[in-house]
UniProtKB/Swiss-Prot annotation:
The keyword Transmembrane applies. It is a single-pass type II membrane protein. This is Glucan endo-1,3-beta-glucosidase btgC. Keywords: Carbohydrate metabolism, Cell membrane, Cell wall biogenesis/degradation, Glycoprotein, Hydrolase, Membrane, Polysaccharide degradation, Signal-anchor, Transmembrane, Transmembrane helix. Its EC number is 3.2.1.39. It comes from Emericella nidulans (strain FGSC A4 / ATCC 38163 / CBS 112.46 / NRRL 194 / M139). The lineage of its organism: Eukaryota, Fungi, Dikarya, Ascomycota, Pezizomycotina. It catalyses: Hydrolysis of (1->3)-beta-D-glucosidic linkages in (1->3)-beta-D-glucans. Residues 1-274 are cytoplasmic. Glycans are attached at N369, N392, N420, N596. The chain crosses the membrane at residues 275-295.
């Protein structure tokens, strides 16, 4: 992943003499008339509430009135605003900038200029002056299935599958933070998790994110001690033989001597009878204690499992108990009837729980959990994106789509690519196997080969670019040879895209996160649109290539980011994580994007509590990007816009 602090200096400062069009002398956006309404999209006078910010400026880098403009061209903007602003197109838009197209400021600090923005941008002021470092506006860590959003995160593969909580597959309660990625009613047993995994020993896909497993067994040491002591007593009374100097380590400080040390001549007559009586009494007491402990432990477990089927329930147990869930299952019907969900997202990023290799070989993920997830996701979107192929995750998603009869659901396949060629070859082989076995590929929108591989490459970015391009060419050749007609793409930070990478992909897929730019939420939607249109849209103009925002979202809590982490002057500066802020970003972004046809994936549907391990100091947002908690419950206070009943295609 690399130390993110070394990655944040990729944003050149904006020279003071280059005041951007549409901004006042103080660098603030020129305010637009009107106090609460703005015409959006192609329809006449689509009114929005005051939450849709009215301070409007223009998007950079292209002519949004053109037919090839991302987001619908003339139909995707407010015409009244567009006709009052001078615009430059293409490369001309950057002629007076500090740098060429390849070096324009990154998404973390771009002051916009040029044409119009349906999201009413108001980009943040760049912290550093012309002669200062631009470290304050930074890139973010990869969001792929298990990567942390903070540099505090341990390397992939460093965590082991943890214990699950004691909640039912049927209840919606939040399970423990140490319960792994997407620990929504985990079917994994905590009893067998390894205590330690060396990431260097794992042929991994970079997706490991398991936290160490705390023991769920109450009084485990005490129970073992009782068993050891009881075993010793019963062995003595029933003549068991033991090796000399045997140690009963569960007993604190117990290096007990061997039974032979206490051996005595066999008693005769009354002494023997008395010994048997005493022995019987003691044996009865010991056996009673053992049975009582076992019953108590069972009842204690059952008490916790009355409200839950805890982590003791395996994936097979789940299927045996609940069957292979489908659209007619009561539990699925309940999930799909959840209030507050609206299908307004063009796409959703998703990683099933427990699809880390090689852990999944021992603790397979639950098909029913994936089916539950897909039931909820089907209420939010018709397109789901995966990040890898390990652990049958793709097959499970496809099975869930079939069981739920989601005829409109489409899937972007994911292939995890890193510096481990064994991982890469395994992932690609699984991709080919999935597609070669199917004659009907209509459910697939494409295959994404790698996520933020360039960002994670650090100083070897150019080599990583060549490798990603080579992998995409390999995949495309296999598809052509096997008559597989789906798109081949990769995804990376918006500021890592250039013409070379764009030429090799069928779709430019950029991850754009205003939160990590320290952008105030009231300006975040416009800033996102402006960045995307300046950095990524020009790369596909005049071509038939697609252009998608592969990740965009906002955390529901955990602090605030001022462009260089949590180093803010107070807790209200910069990008503030919170339910209120998430709601505002959705209000400003979701419906206008739906109206003008902006294609994007929301990050993400469900919280990932295992990422709490990556939180540090005042940066406590790693595990809080979901619209819902890990139990598939809409977070209290979260309001997904209904966009007047309009739904995503």
């Amino acid at each position: 992943m690399g130390d993110r602090s070394e990655q944040y200096g990729d944003i050149p400062p904006i020279s003071s003499q280059h005041r951007m069009h549409g901004y006042g002398n103080n660098g603030e956006p020129a305010a637009m008339p009107g106090d609460g309404q703005q015409n959006w999209g192609s329809g006449p006078g689509i009114a929005h509430t005051h939450s849709m910010r009215t301070a409007s400026t223009a998007t950079p880098g292209m002519d949004n009135l053109g037919p090839s403009a991302v987001g619908g061209g003339i139909s995707g903007i407010a015409l009244g605003v567009a006709n009052t602003h001078d615009r430059q197109s293409g490369i001309d838009a950057f002629r007076d900038a500090d740098a060429t197209l390849g070096y324009i400021p990154a998404e973390r600090g771009y002051h916009t200029t040029g044409a119009d923005n349906p999201y009413v941008p108001s980009p943040p002021s760049v912290g550093p002056g012309p002669d200062e470092s631009s470290e304050g506006l930074r890139s973010h860590e990869t969001f792929g299935s298990s990567a942390a959003l903070s540099a505090a995160g341990a390397p992939a593969g460093n965590w082991t599958p943890p214990s699950g909580s004691r909640h039912s597959f049927l209840d919606g309660s939040y399970q423990g933070v140490a319960s792994g990625p997407y620990q929504r009613h985990s079917a994994y047993s905590s009893q067998d998790y390894p205590a330690d995994i060396n990431p260097d020993d794992i042929l991994d896909d970079g997706d490991d994110g398991f936290a160490a497993a705390p023991s769920n067994k109450p009084n485990a040491a005490g129970g073992a001690a009782t068993g050891g002591a009881a075993g010793g007593l019963l062995g003595e009374f029933f003549g068991a033989k033991k090796a000399a100097d045997a140690s009963y380590d569960p007993v604190p400080g117990a290096g007990l001597p061997s039974v032979e040390k206490y051996a005595k001549p066999r008693p005769s007559g009354a002494s023997r009878k008395r010994g048997w009586i005493i022995g019987g009494i003691l044996a009865f007491i010991v056996i009673g204690a053992i049975v009582g402990g076992a019953v108590g432990g069972t009842l204690g477990n059952r008490r916790s499992e009355t409200a839950s089927e805890s982590s003791e329930v395996s994936a097979d147990d789940d299927t045996e108990t609940n069957g292979d869930l489908d659209k007619n299952s009561d539990e699925i019907k309940s999930l799909m009837a959840m209030e507050g969900l609206h299908k307004v997202f063009p796409g959703m990023d998703y990683t099933p729980w427990g699809v880390q290799h090689p852990e999944c070989d021992k603790w397979p993920p639950s098909q029913n959990n994936v089916t539950r997830d897909m039931a909820v996701l089907s209420r939010l979107t018709n397109t789901v994106r995966l990040y890898g192929t390990d652990c049958n995750q793709t097959e499970m998603v496809l099975h869930a789509i079939d069981r739920l009869e989601l005829t409109d659901m489409k899937l972007w396949l994911g292939v995890w690519i890193d510096t481990n060629t064994t991982t890469n070859e395994r992932q690609l082989s699984q991709l080919y196997d999935i597609l070669d076995k199917r004659s009907d590929h209509s459910v697939f929108k494409g295959a994404i080969i790698g996520n933020e591989a360039l960002y994670r490459a650090g100083s070897t970015k150019e080599e990583a670019r060549k490798n990603i391009i080579d992998y995409m060419r390999q995949v495309r050749k296999h598809f052509n040879d096997h008559n597989i007609d789906i798109k081949v793409a990769t995804s990376d930070l918006g500021d890592n895209w250039d013409e070379t990478l764009a030429d090799a992909t069928d779709v430019v897929m950029s991850n754009v996160h205003p939160f990590f730019g320290g952008v105030e939420v009231s300006k975040a939607a416009g800033w996102t649109w402006s960045f995307w249109n300046s950095h990524n849209a020009p790369l596909t103009q005049g071509t038939n290539k697609g252009n998608i925002i592969a990740e965009v979202g906002w955390p529901s809590g955990g602090g605030n980011d001022c462009g260089d982490g949590a180093n803010c002057k107070d807790d209200t500066s910069g990008a503030v994580a919170g339910v209120k802020q998430m709601n505002q970003f959705m209000a400003d972004w979701v419906c206008p994007a739906l109206e003008n046809g902006t294609d994007y994936f929301w990050f993400e549907a469900f919280d990932e509590p295992w990422k709490v391990k990556f939180n540090k100091g005042d940066e406590q947002w790693e595990d809080k990007w979901g619209l819902m908690d890990p139990g598939r419950n809409l977070k209290p206070g979260i309001e997904i816009p209904d966009c007047g009943g309009k739904t995503a295609a």
